[in-house]
């Protein structure tokens, strides 16, 4: 048998851990899990239960997106998980057969089977021992798939309920593997603080660029803040000091921290681009409203710098979720307080600039786009105690068509009207992903 | 006097024998450290591997047991085959044509197998296992033919032992795939099989210590992990 030579791989495929990253996942049948380059069939919405509304429970809601379907734009299924857990984020397993989701208050992890019937996910397994397994980590936030395991970021700890936290790794069977505490000034674990950086030990998101063996984590705030009423927290000067100001660069293979960057104002979501030579990532800061670039310099060292303002930082629009296009040319950035989405041209990542904006609703958080960028979806909830109140507490999923110039609404699902709850993270599903 | 002469003579012969042994006995050539130096970096992996032993490899889960058949058709317990050596385990089907699939897994194994010729003594500690997940077509005869380039390699004795295995059917195969977490999906036409490319590093005690997928198949990383396990065993 002849050995074959292989050139560059599409290693960036697994870099971001976003659902449609799985497209270029390895396969002996091209592709095992085809990327949803065409039409996404379903969107799963991890939804927070609301006291006094419907069954009052957190739930995974499925909305039909199939063109021509009689139920297009409608909720076709819902799986309630019992209780209100502060449902927040989730991520697919590397084989995209399961969707792991977390509760930031109860620390329960709910794993849904999305492959047996993609139109009707089922609760497969619940992990109730996250805090005990991990040695005191609280707030399972981001679920980032690696081959054979799931890397979960924490937000807090059960010692002081502040922001000091860790990464926690489970295997694909849902068994605990290891905990990696974030570096702190007292225990840098071999990492180097760059410039004015002070390692605060906080966490939030995690993303990786496998080709470079680089993993990045960001920093938010702990349980005592994210479960506090938003208005009350804003008035609490001590609480307002307890936000993260760091992004940490890790060695992906060894899970060891290497550098701590000073990124003031709570950097949240991290996104790596798709290009095979694109050695950088974006993040946005919630409190200081800046777009940051974490990039490899000419000497091969990673650096971090602010590259643009988002809206008027003095207004504190509070940037939240972001979504990078498949061609790396544009970046949607949502801001919670003004309910806006803004589109940035990032064709030169060092000099991004805004090219479009639109008010989606009174509040907005998450944004997900189709592979071709022509369909963009928004959802509303940030945190149960931070969402706006009264008539400003709009809870929805809204679908838009984007033609490169204008977002035009396609359909909207009112989650309160349907008695479902607060709509949070969205992830796409498709029966085309699974052969059997 | 004769006795003393005899004794002296014997002593001289013994000394000469010792010296001769030192001159004629082959001194094993040194193994490069880190072992990953036997590979050059590729464009696909733009980083330096970590220093072996500078990190720990988690125990991810227990590698499953199962009944497998070797190229002679002899049945073995998978645990019996993996116990006692550090094993790199891959799953393929031999009629796979996707360049980013099974051929890639095989190519990485060929690279490691070939390079092991420059890593003297590694074959005492490390082995390769390739298991087919298509028992219907990958019969004992088929895997024997597939393994021919490996078994007929004149330098096979210096390289890692590489076993190509199959199973007698889906009933024997399923617990192995499920236990490893190797996802395999047959299309309706049954001709094409989709699977996620995965390599597994199993330690001597039978625990899976790392799982590699597309994007992680840097042979330098594989060797670095193997060297890290060896150092762990040595108490370094």
Curated annotation (Swiss-Prot), chain A:
Leader sequence residues: 1-24
Catalytic reactions of this protein: methanethiol + O2 + H2O = hydrogen sulfide + formaldehyde + H2O2 + H(+)
Compartment list: Periplasm
Root EC class: oxidoreductase
Pfam families referenced in this protein's UniProt entry, alphabetically: SBP56
Domain of life: Bacteria
Keywords for this protein: Oxidoreductase, Periplasm, Plasmid, Signal
E.C. number: 1.8.3.4
InterPro entries named among the record's database cross-references: Quino_amine_DH_bsu (IPR011044), Se-bd (IPR008826)
GO CC, alphabetical: periplasmic space
Similarity annotation: Belongs to the selenium-binding protein family.
Function: Catalyzes the oxidation of methanethiol.
Name the UniProt record assigns to this protein: Methanethiol oxidase
The organism's taxonomic lineage, starting at the top: Bacteria, Pseudomonadati, Pseudomonadota, Alphaproteobacteria, Rhodobacterales
Gene: mtoX
């Amino acid at each position: 048998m002849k050995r074959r030579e292989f050139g560059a791989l599409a290693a960036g495929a697994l870099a971001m851990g976003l659902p449609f990253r799985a497209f270029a996942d390895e396969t002996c049948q091209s592709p095992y899990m085809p990327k949803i380059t065409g039409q996404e069939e379903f969107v799963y919405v991890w939804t927070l239960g609301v006291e006094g509304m419907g069954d009052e429970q957190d739930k995974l809601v499925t909305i039909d997106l199939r063109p021509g379907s009689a139920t297009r734009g409608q909720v076709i299924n819902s799986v309630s998980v019992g209780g209100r857990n502060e449902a927040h984020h989730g991520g697919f397993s590397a084989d995209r057969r399961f969707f792991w989701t977390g509760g930031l208050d109860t620390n329960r992890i709910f794993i849904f089977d999305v492959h047996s019937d993609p139109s009707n996910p089922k609760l497969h397994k619940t992990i109730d021992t996250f805090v005990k397994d991990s040695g005191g980590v609280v707030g399972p936030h981001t679920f980032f798939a690696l081959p054979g395991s799931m890397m979960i970021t924490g937000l807090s700890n059960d010692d002081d309920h502040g922001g000091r936290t860790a990464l926690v790794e489970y295997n694909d069977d849902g068994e605990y593997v290891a905990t990696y505490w974030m570096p702190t000034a007292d225990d840098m674990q071999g990492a180097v603080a760059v410039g004015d950086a002070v390692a605060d030990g906080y966490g939030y998101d995690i993303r990786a660029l496998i080709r470079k063996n680089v993993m990045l984590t960001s920093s938010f705030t702990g349980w005592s803040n994210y479960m506090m009423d938003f208005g009350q927290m804003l008035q609490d000067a001590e609480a307002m000091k307890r936000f993260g100001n760091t992004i940490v660069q890790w060695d992906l293979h060894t899970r060891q921290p290497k550098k701590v960057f000073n990124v003031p104002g709570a950097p949240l979501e991290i996104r790596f681009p798709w290009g095979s030579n694109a050695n950088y990532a974006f993040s946005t800061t919630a409190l200081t409203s800046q777009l940051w670039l974490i990039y490899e310099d000419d000497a091969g060292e990673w650096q971090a710098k602010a590259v643009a303002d988002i809206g008027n930082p003095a207004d504190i629009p509070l940037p939240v979720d972001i979504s990078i296009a498949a061609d790396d040319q544009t970046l949607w950035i949502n801001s919670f307080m003004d309910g806006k989405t803004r589109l940035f041209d990032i064709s030169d990542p060092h000099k991004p600039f805004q090219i479009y904006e639109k008010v989606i609703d009174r509040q907005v958080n998450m944004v997900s786009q189709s592979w071709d960028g022509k369909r963009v979806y928004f959802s509303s909830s940030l945190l149960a105690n931070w969402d706006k109140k009264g008539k400003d507490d709009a809870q929805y999923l809204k679908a838009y068509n984007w033609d490169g110039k204008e977002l035009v609404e396609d359909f909207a699902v009112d989650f309160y009207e349907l008695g479902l709850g607060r709509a949070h993270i969205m992830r796409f599903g498709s029966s085309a992903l699974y052969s059997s | 006097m004769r006795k003393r002469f005899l004794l002296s003579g014997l002593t001289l012969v013994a000394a000469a024998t010792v010296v001769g042994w030192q001159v004629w006995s082959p001194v094993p050539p040194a193994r490069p450290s880190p072992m990953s130096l036997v590979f050059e970096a590729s464009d696909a992996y733009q980083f330096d591997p970590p220093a072996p032993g500078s990190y720990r490899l988690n125990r991810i889960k227990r590698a499953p047991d199962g009944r497998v058949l070797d190229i002679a058709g002899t049945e073995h317990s998978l645990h019996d085959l993996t116990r006692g050596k550090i094993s790199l385990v891959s799953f393929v089907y031999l009629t796979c044509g996707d360049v980013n699939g099974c051929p890639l897994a095989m190519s990485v194994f060929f690279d490691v197998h070939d390079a092991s010729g420059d890593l003297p003594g590694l074959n005492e500690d490390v082995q390769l296992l390739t298991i087919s997940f298509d028992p219907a077509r990958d019969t004992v005869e088929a895997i024997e033919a597939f393994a021919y380039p490996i078994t007929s390699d004149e330098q096979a004795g210096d390289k890692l032992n590489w076993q190509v295995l199959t199973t007698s059917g889906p009933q024997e195969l399923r617990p192995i795939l499920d236990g490893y977490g190797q996802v395999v999906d047959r299309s309706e036409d049954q001709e094409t099989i989709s699977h996620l490319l995965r390599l597994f590093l199993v330690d001597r005690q039978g625990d899976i210590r790392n799982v590699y997928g597309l994007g992680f198949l840097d042979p330098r990383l594989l060797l670095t992990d193997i060297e890290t396990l060896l150092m762990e065993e040595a108490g370094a």
